[in-house]
């Protein structure tokens, strides 16, 4: 009926996002999330993990934790177009990036943001969710490919411009937290020794690196916020890895440990 349709129309027309909309988008049976799970299972798993980290961290500073979790679920939907080019979806020993030049690799990475924003509009995701797609990398440098380009340049000048995400930098506490959770989750998967002290070291390093590079300058996060966010990340990751290490001889702990590599 018109009465039922009016709030939906108003929300879309005036770019207001209600908790009801966010709750609907947080349902893992949402068609877009089902599509992500089917086409890019590694990215889907990563996004759920980022959601858990972001929700806890946002709660610790009194932000909108539901918004942070939902934003995290959708931040990487653009990876569905070429899932095999992203490390979390790759089979062992198969990385199509190795066949590309560093510049081409950077274009593939850049494209997941553009494609994600396109899909957000196509599926009529609220603007506040679209912001997570644009802002979760800010203007950060794709350091691995930039260094590779420098090595191959034989001393010629290589501009870092084409190896940077276009931004904008995170504008809200929630998008800034998802940027941090995204980096921390990806780094935690590479840990050979996920001891509490190593996790603490990695989390603090990643948060510090983003802060010092200026990526958080446009967000309202304070230093006290960053300290609380860091603690929240550590608590969750230590809990996850503790469960995996606890039972060294059980098959479940082995498969869980393998899944982090």
Residue ranges and their predicted role:
Residues 9-51:
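Membrane-proximal helical linkers
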């Amino acid at each position: 009926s018109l009465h039922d349709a009016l709030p939906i129309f108003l929300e879309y027309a005036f770019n207001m996002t209600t908790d009801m909309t966010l709750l609907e988008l947080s349902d893992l049976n949402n068609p877009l999330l089902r599509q992500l799970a089917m086409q890019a299972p590694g990215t889907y798993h990563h996004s759920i993990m980022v959601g858990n980290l972001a929700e806890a961290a946002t709660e610790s500073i009194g932000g909108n934790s539901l918004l942070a979790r939902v934003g995290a679920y959708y931040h990487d939907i653009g990876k569905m177009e070429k899932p095999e080019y992203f490390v979390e979806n790759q089979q062992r020993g198969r990385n199509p990036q190795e066949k590309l030049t560093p510049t081409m690799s950077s274009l593939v990475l850049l494209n997941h943001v553009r494609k994600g924003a396109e899909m957000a509009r196509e599926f009529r995701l609220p603007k506040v969710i679209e912001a997570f797609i644009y802002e979760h990398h800010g203007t950060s440098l794709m350091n691995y490919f930039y260094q590779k380009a420098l090595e191959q340049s034989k001393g010629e000048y290589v501009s870092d411009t084409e190896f940077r995400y276009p931004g904008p930098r995170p504008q809200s506490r929630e998008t800034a937290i998802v940027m941090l959770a995204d980096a921390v989750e990806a780094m935690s998967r590479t840990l050979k020794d996920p001891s509490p002290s190593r996790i603490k070291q990695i989390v603090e390093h990643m948060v510090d690196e983003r802060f010092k590079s200026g990526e958080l300058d446009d967000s309202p996060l304070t230093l006290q916020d960053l300290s609380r966010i860091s603690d929240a990340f550590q608590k969750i990751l230590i809990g996850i890895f503790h469960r995996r290490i606890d039972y060294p001889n059980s098959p479940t702990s082995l498969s869980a440990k393998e899944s982090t590599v």
